[in-house]
């Protein structure tokens, strides 16, 4: 536009003989003079509409229109639904609007040249086009582009039909060369968009800090791995399969407050299953039965680089809420990286994880009565069986699943709560937790610590009374036998607290 105006000024300078306000073709005040002025005003208005629609419609992306069509107000839904089919023809629409805008701006100086001197005509055309054909329309359409585009959609459709012979071929060429602009947001862009809409950003957003944290955690869930969220095996409370379920062991289980406890054989890294604490309700502590006498359920194994999103999907099936994290072999790591480089989604990667010889896939379509047969050695275990002597009990051909196999050792335990903590990006602390962050060894709040210290300072009679009530609820005994039970369970606890 600036180039055209410059050329017109040069042309006017060469043809200027005298500064006359009125041209000789059409006299001022004649009917034709008013007709030309009306045409000039129409051209300015038409050029302004085309300029505003170019900015308003082309600034509306397909993704934005689809969002408004689904989640906008009733008026926005109607407007977005009407505009979307037209905006999908991006390049044809662009060529149509630019052709009409250029035609109006080129015709304006010609009309004004009939009633004004060429120099005055160029000066007026540049002024009116800038003010009423560019600045004001684009300022309005940049703010109300959706509403303006919907109201002038009938005009746009007519112009697209008129300019079809020229706009359609050029639009197809642009589609082939440039392509369509329908890029979606990346994860980082979505997180930044959510953070901008938070109340803490101070930009009028309605999302609270907790809501933004949860949304960001959900976006990061497929990027985080099991190794990042697991509890290290060294910090995990577990039981040997030959441990006697006496009062001391039951007291430790009660003090931990876990609902599921991993069970190992010989080496704590040799996890063979898990024990549901509620299954101990029928166990009599005076019999000192080993853990192997209770139903030990299968514990699924997942590779350390498995995304938390896939683990959450498997936990949702209800087969298990605890899994053993296994160290991935270098060979399987390379295969996994090759799968990721091929652009496969996390769901497609599940095929790799489930077929890996390091892991046992999470239980599917199995009832909760499935237990581990500790007398049967799995086929994939190289060490068929070994004899262990612990607590005076000798095991018979119990499988050593992962011992002496450094590439497939269990390095941690992951639970559904761990995945939820990564989703919420905050630690979930209950009344039995000792540490908020197991990795950093950060203890719980002072209130919980004070409660623990108050129990430690309590008298033996008070401790026996409290533990007796708990044992009575668990084992279902009458009050007459509670005293003997509490004496047996509190003696080792008191001895340990005196240390």
From Swiss-Prot:
Sorted UniProt keywords? CBS domain, Glycoprotein, Membrane, Repeat, Transmembrane, Transmembrane helix
Question: Which residues are reported to be glycosylated?
Answer: 181, 357, 391, 484
Compartmental location: Membrane
Q: Please list the residue ranges that the record places on the Extracellular side of the membrane.
A: 1-32, 113-114, 167-499
**Residue limits of the CBS domain?**
230-291, 295-359, 365-431
Topology within the bilayer: Multi-pass membrane protein
Q: Which domain of life is it from?
A: Eukaryota
Gene Ontology, cellular component aspect: membrane
Gene Ontology BP terms: magnesium ion homeostasis
**Membrane among the record's keywords?**
yes
Q: Which InterPro entries match?
A: ACDP (IPR045095), CBS_dom_sf (IPR046342), CNNM (IPR002550), Ion_transp-like_CBS (IPR044751)
User: Where does the record locate the signal sequence feature?
Assistant: none
Q: What PROSITE patterns does this protein map onto?
A: CNNM
Q: Where is the CNNM transmembrane domain?
A: 29-211
Q: Where are the transmembrane segments?
A: 33-53, 92-112, 115-135, 146-166
Name of the protein this chain belongs to: Putative DUF21 domain-containing protein At1g03270
Q: Which organism is it from?
A: Arabidopsis thaliana
């Amino acid at each position: 536009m600036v180039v055209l105006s410059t050329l017109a000024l040069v042309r006017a300078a060469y043809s200027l003989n005298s500064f006359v306000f009125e041209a000789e073709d059409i006299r001022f005040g004649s009917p034709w003079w008013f007709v030309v002025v009306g045409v000039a005003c129409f051209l300015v208005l038409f050029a302004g509409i085309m300029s505003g629609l170019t900015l308003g419609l082309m600034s509306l992306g397909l993704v934005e229109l689809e969002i408004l069509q689904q989640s906008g107000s009733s008026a926005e839904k109607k407007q977005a639904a009407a505009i979307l089919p037209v905006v999908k023809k991006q390049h044809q629409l662009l060529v149509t609007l630019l052709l009409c805008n250029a035609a109006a701006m080129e015709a304006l100086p010609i009309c004004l040249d009939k009633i004004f001197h060429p120099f005055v005509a160029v000066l007026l055309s540049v002024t009116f086009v800038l003010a009423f054909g560019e600045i004001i329309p684009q300022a309005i359409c940049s703010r109300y582009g959706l509403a303006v585009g919907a109201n002038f959609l009938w005009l746009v459709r007519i112009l697209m039909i008129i300019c079809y012979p020229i706009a359609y071929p050029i639009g197809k060429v642009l589609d082939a060369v440039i392509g369509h602009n329908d890029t979606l947001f990346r994860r980082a862009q979505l997180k930044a968009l959510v953070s901008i809409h938070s109340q803490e950003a101070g930009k009028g957003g309605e999302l609270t800090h907790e809501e933004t944290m949860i949304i960001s955690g959900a976006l990061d869930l497929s990027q985080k791995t099991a190794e990042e969220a697991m509890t290290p095996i060294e910090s995990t409370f577990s039981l040997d399969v030959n441990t006697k379920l006496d009062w001391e062991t039951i007291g430790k289980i009660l003090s931990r407050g876990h609902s599921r406890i991993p069970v190992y054989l010989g080496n704590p890294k040799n996890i063979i299953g898990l024990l549901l604490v509620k299954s101990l309700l029928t166990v009599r502590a005076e019999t000192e039965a080993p853990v192997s006498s209770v139903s030990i359920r299968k514990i699924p194994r997942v590779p350390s680089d498995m995304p938390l999103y896939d683990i959450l999907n498997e936990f949702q099936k209800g087969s298990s809420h605890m899994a053993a994290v296994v160290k991935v072999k270098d060979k399987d790591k390379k295969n996994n990286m090759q799968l990721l480089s091929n652009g496969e989604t996390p769901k497609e990667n599940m095929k790799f994880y489930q077929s890996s010889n390091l892991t046992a896939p999470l239980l599917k379509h199995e009832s909760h009565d499935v237990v581990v047969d500790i007398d049967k050695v799995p086929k994939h275990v190289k060490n068929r069986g070994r004899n262990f002597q612990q607590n005076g009990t000798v095991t018979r051909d119990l499988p050593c699943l992962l011992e002496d196999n450094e590439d497939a050792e269990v390095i941690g335990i992951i639970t559904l709560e761990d995945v939820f903590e990564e989703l919420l990006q905050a630690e979930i602390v209950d009344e039995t937790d000792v540490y908020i962050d197991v990795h950093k060894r950060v203890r719980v709040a002072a209130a919980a610590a004070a409660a623990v210290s108050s129990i430690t300072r309590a008298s033996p009679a008070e401790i026996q009374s409290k533990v007796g009530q708990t044992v009575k609820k668990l084992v279902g005994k009458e009050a007459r036998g509670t005293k003997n039970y509490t004496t047996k369970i509190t003696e080792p606890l008191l001895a340990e607290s005196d240390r």
